[in-house]
From Swiss-Prot:
Residues 1-24 form the signal peptide. Residues 54-159, 160-268, 269-383, 384-486, 487-608 form the Cadherin domain. This is Cadherin-18. Glycans are attached at N36, N255, N455, N536. InterPro entries: Cadherin, Cadherin-like_dom, Cadherin-like_sf, Cadherin_CS, Cadherin_Y-type_LIR, Catenin-bd_sf. Gene3D superfamilies: Cadherins, TCF3-CBD (Catenin binding domain). The chain crosses the membrane at residues 609-636. The gene is CDH18. The modification Phosphoserine is found at S786.
């Protein structure tokens, strides 16, 4: 390939143009082009040319954490218009101007007055301005510049997530990754090695290692065994400056735990065990425990136990307790010391969760031998059967043998056994048992229809040790004998229609028997052979334990005979057979053409109305009694006597009620006007009933006449004289008692009649003493009194 001079010059020119552009933009040092200012003055154009000016400075840096006594020099601002005569004044504004950064307004030197921290603020943005000191006019436009804080290595690496807790399976391969740790450095990663971190392990060797660049922790050994050591503490260091001398460092702790794997088989502590079990141990109960040890933990130590061989395989069983990991030995069948005194079992314990990576460490199971010694125990008697069932016929005589139970002493001593029935307090004792032989007999006559089955409990004990008891249940079934005749299943209401035809079935009947099925059905129905043939009805046995009632003639009449009676016989199928007789009542009723009953005799009518004969009689009696009471009341009203005095000029009685402040007078019944009307009534009312009369009055015989022929005045005078002289008559004028309202008034009662005095005896002069209100009343009565006197 041929390269010409033209092709080489062009790239060089392009690079120079790029450098010049960057230099002028970055450092604000490019010479600004002159700007033409055009003025229009009276049609002429005047052009002014401005001289070229510009800022001159380098990029500013300030070192962080400067602790010197003098302010730290940052840099210098300079304008091309500054001739060094002090006419240019430099002004600094922006972040930290005047507080952190100060400027010499004459020279443009910038100093830092405080210690800065790059980790808090990496740079500051400020503005520079150059003005004429005399006119305060800007010589340069305001320009922005940046002061960067230069980093130093003042921050150590830090582990943000420590300390760490991590696990790794035991027996892991070398180089297995455990954990990656990361440390951070707050220094500037773009400047020097202040933030370049290198990892190393300070503690935990030779078991673990760490990658210096990534911080990944790995296992450094093969087959680390948890059973030998489970916990490890590893210290990791992170150092900046790429691990060089003088670099800052930080550390963290990583706690590593080896998790378990199934790498250990179970082991029995002993190869031979011996266990004592008494022969009285209950079937299903636990008789012993055995345990194999496993160095693993959790599910890796789970195991199951089994009986692999031995002469007690069918007698004992073993199960596993998952919580304690023990083998529980239980009894499957009862033990008998007299038959076998010891057993031998081979028991195996095997892990249930296997890890095939470690199968070469197996087998993961172990076996041991267990010898069981059976202990001799004095046992209660043993019945020959677990339960007994016996039978006896009902109505058997008292003392009938039902059956026999048998119990023996299972021990070698073979002592005698006694029997008794274990009754409850409320049981009715129908049986007893011979204490020596165990024979059960009846003590009462049994009835199968009342109780078909009995359950009793028989107990047996040894003579030498009565406290040892054994029990057995004896069920006694009562067998049936044919001792109950059949009877009708229910009461039948049989109806025959008046328009019935011969051979018509009017009803079907059935029977029941309290005896067992063998002595009950089949039932036979028939008419009594000793009676004459019934001309009206007959009976047909349906041979299915039912019978039909049939008519033997046409038409029945209620007016001639409304009820018929049909005697029948029923026999059962027992041996010997029993029979009974019953009488069927057949009513004659009027029916519709379709056979529906329309009406029967009076009893049927009452039944349809819902009333019985007794209820109807009671209703009729009540009606008769009510009618008799009404008639008697009317008769008494009509027979009442009229009063003797009947006149149009009869005395009128007016009762006037005033405001009475007392309890009423005692003489309210003293005067009765009927005495003037009926003299005989007056004779009854004039005597007092509260006292016995002192003088017996002679009866007065006088002929009564009509009211027109009697002198009323003489009659009244005569009665008044008799009343005044008779001490036994009621007092017509009596003292009235009222509520007490002060001293007794001098005025007397004016509401009663004085039968023994007259108005002339009254003295009304006292009215003048009552006051001026009663003066007129006193004068009025005084004049009347004076007129009477004259």
């Amino acid at each position: 390939m041929k390269i010409t001079s033209t092709s080489c010059i062009c790239p060089v020119l392009v690079c120079l143009c790029f450098v010049q552009r960057c230099y002028g933009t970055t450092h604000h040092g490019s010479i600004r082009g002159t700007r033409n200012q055009t003025k229009h003055i009276e049609g002429e154009t005047e052009v002014h040319h401005r001289p070229k000016r510009g800022w001159v400075w380098n990029q500013f840096f300030v070192l962080e954490e400067h602790m010197g006594p003098d302010p730290q020099y940052v840099g210098k601002l300079h304008s091309n218009s500054d001739k060094g005569d002090g006419s240019v004044k430099y002004i600094l504004t922006g972040e930290g101007a005047g507080t952190i950064f100060i400027i010499d307004d004459t020279t443009g030197d910038i100093h830092s007055t405080k210690s800065l921290d790059r980790e808090q603020k990496t740079h500051y943005v400020l503005h520079a301005q150059a003005i004429d000191r005399r006119t305060n006019k800007p010589l340069e436009p305001e320009s922005e510049f940046i002061i960067k804080v230069q980093d130093i290595n003042d921050n150590a690496p830090k582990f943000t997530d420590g300390p760490y807790i991590v696990t790794v399976p035991e027996m892991s391969d070398m180089g297995t990754s455990v954990l990656q740790v990361t440390a951070t450095d707050a220094d500037d990663p773009t400047y020097g090695n202040s933030a370049r971190v290198v990892y190393s392990i300070l503690q935990g060797q030779p078991y673990f290692s760490v990658d210096p660049k990534t911080g990944v922790i790995r296992t450094a050994l093969h087959n680390m065994d948890r059973e030998a050591r489970e916990h490890y503490s590893v210290v990791i260091q992170a150092k900046d400056m790429a691990g060089q001398v003088g670099g800052l460092s930080g550390s963290t702790t990583v706690n590593i735990t080896l998790t378990d794997v199934n790498d250990n088989p179970p082991r029995f502590p002993q190869k031979h065990y011996q266990l004592y079990v008494p022969e009285s141990a209950q079937v299903g109960s636990a008789v012993g425990k055995i345990k194999a040890n496993d160095a693993d933990t959790g599910s890796n130590a789970d195991m199951t136990y089994s009986i692999i061989n031995g002469d007690g395989v069918g007698i004992f069983s073993i199960s596993t307790d998952k919580e304690t990991r023990e083998g529980i030995l239980s009894l499957k069948k009862p033990l008998n010391y007299e038959k076998k005194k010891s057993y031998t079992l081979n028991i195996e314990g095997a892990n249930t969760h296997l890890d095939f990576r470690f199968s070469h460490l197996g087998p993961f199971k172990d076996a041991t031998m267990l010898k069981i010694i059976v202990g001799d125990v004095d046992e209660p008697p043993l019945f020959s059967m677990p339960s007994y069932v016996m039978e006896v016929y009902e109505n058997a005589k008292i003392g009938t043998v039902v059956g026999t139970v048998l119990a023996q002493d299972p021990d070698s001593a073979n002592s005698l056994v006694r029997y008794f029935i274990d009754y409850n307090a409320e049981d009715d004792r129908f049986f007893n048992i011979d204490a020596n032989t165990g024979t059960i007999k009846t003590t009462k006559v049994l009835d199968r229809e009342e109780t078909p089955w009995y359950n009793i409990t028989v107990a047996a004990s040894e003579n030498d040790n009565p406290s040892l008891l054994s029990h057995v249940t004896v069920g006694i079934r009562v067998l049936d004998v044919n001792d109950n005749p059949p009877e009708l299943a229910r009461e039948y209401d049989i109806v025959v229609c008046e328009n019935s035809k011969p051979g018509q079935v009017i009803h079907t009947i059935s029977a029941t028997d309290k005896d067992d099925f063998a002595n009950g059905p089949r039932f036979n129905f028939f008419l009594d052979e000793h009676l004459s043939i019934n001309p009206n009805f007959t009976l047909k046995d349906n041979e299915d334990n039912t019978a039909s009632i049939l008519t033997r003639r046409r038409r029945f009449s209620r007016t001639i005979q409304d009820v018929y009676y049909l005697p029948i016989m029923i026999s059962d199928g027992g041996i010997p057979s029993l029979s009974s007789s019953s009488t069927l009542t057949i009513r004659v009723c009027a029916c519709e053409r379709d056979g529906r009953v329309r009406t029967c005799h009076a009893e049927a009518f009452l039944s349809s109305a819902g009333l019985s004969t007794g209820a109807l009689i009671a209703i009729l009696l009540c009606v008769v009694i009510l009618l008799a009471i009404v008639v008697l009341f009317i008769t008494l009203r009509r027979s009442k006597k009229e009063p003797l005095i009947i006149s149009e000029e009869d005395v009128r009685e007016n009762v006037v009620t005033y405001d009475d402040e007392g309890g009423g007078e005692e003489d309210t019944e003293a005067f009765d006007i009927t005495a003037l009307r009926n003299p005989s009534a007056a004779e009854e009312l004039k005597y007092r009933r509260d006292i016995r009369p002192e003088v017996k009055l002679t009866p007065r015989h006088q002929t009564l006449s009509t009211l027109e022929s009697i002198d009323v005045q003489e009659f009244i005078k005569q009665r008044l004289a008799e009343a005044d002289l008779d001490p036994s008559v009621p007092p017509y004028d009596s003292l009235q008692t009222y509520a007490y309202e002060g001293q007794r008034s001098e005025a007397g009662s004016i509401s009663s009649l004085d039968s023994a005095t007259t108005q002339s005896d009254q003295d009304y002069q006292y009215l003048g003493d009552w006051g001026p209100e009663f003066k007129t009343l006193a004068e009025l009565y005084g004049e009347i009194e004076s007129e009477r006197t004259t």
